[in-house]
Amino acid sequence: MKKLLLITSIVTLGYFSMSGQITSRGPVDLWNWKVELPSGYKASDWKLSNFHNDRFAAPFFYLNEDESALVLEAFPSEGTSTAKYTRNTLREQLQAGSNDVNWTMKEGGVLEVEMEVESMSKGANGQYHRTILLQVDGRTTSKQTKQLGLEKPVSLPMLKIYWQEGYLKVVRKVLKDESTAGDALLSKNSWKEDKNTKHSESKVGFEKVRVRLELKRGKIVLQINDERPIVYRDLSVAQWYFENYFTVGNYLQTKDIGSHSTVNYYKIEVKH
């Protein structure tokens, strides 16, 4: 990505004209996103822009016009998906149709969403299943991949935000050894899941919640509603040299028969 590139990608739940004004006609603007459904079906740019007429999108991905909400349904489905669990996600694409143009911590990124978990199934233990709502994913750049002598980029999530028992739970990657340096920083084996997880102060349950996630060199700030911000500013953040992209959705963490979850998105806005 060019250093001076400025991208603003907005999904406003309503309809857009070519001028960007909300109108009663036209598709939701998802030009800079790629969807992957529980069936394994994927679509981006021009194909995704017509999702409301796409028979593959229903019943997983649709617009609730009465509520002005983009609805993401997740339940186990037969198909070509190779995901471990039940994935229904939107992947940010700075260049429409391409996964190869992303952003670095130096360039930074801000994700703002308003969302609501409408329903969630329970497991045999009586507890609600959980889903990943938001994620910051990392991968090696083309240059880094070549430097490591690999054919495919190394990919791993930097940060995940789960809905778990009605709370938002934040999980991130940290260095196993803070003295790690050089190419070793780009190895999955150098990173582990932080045991010091964070939670929203209040139970969000099945109510609307606002989240603002800002990343820049050496710092991550997460704002949930009007709560005190969750701030990460340590060596693990400073030494994250992967390029990144945002993921938004409903990644249900189970494939149990009869499991399901519904998430409504009222606002998705990305700025770089």
Regions found by a protein language model. Give the residues of each.
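Bacterial Sec-dependent N-terminal signal peptides
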Residues: 1-21
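Short tryptophan-centered beta-strand motifs in secreted/extracellular beta-sheet-rich domains
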Residues: 113, 207-215, 220-222
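Ligand-recognition surfaces built from glycine- and aromatic
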Residues: 22-30, 108-110, 122-126, 202, ...
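Short strand-turn-strand beta-turns centered on an Asx-Gly dipeptide
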Residues: 224-228
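Surface-exposed coil/turn segments at beta-strand junctions on protein surfaces, enriched
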Residues: 65, 104-106, 202-206, 215
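Secretory/extracellular carbohydrate-interaction modules
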Residues: 53-57, 61-177
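Short, aromatic/His-centered strand-loop micro-motif at the edge of beta-sheets
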Residues: 173-210
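N-terminal module-boundary/linker segments of secreted carbohydrate-active enzymes
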Residues: 21-54
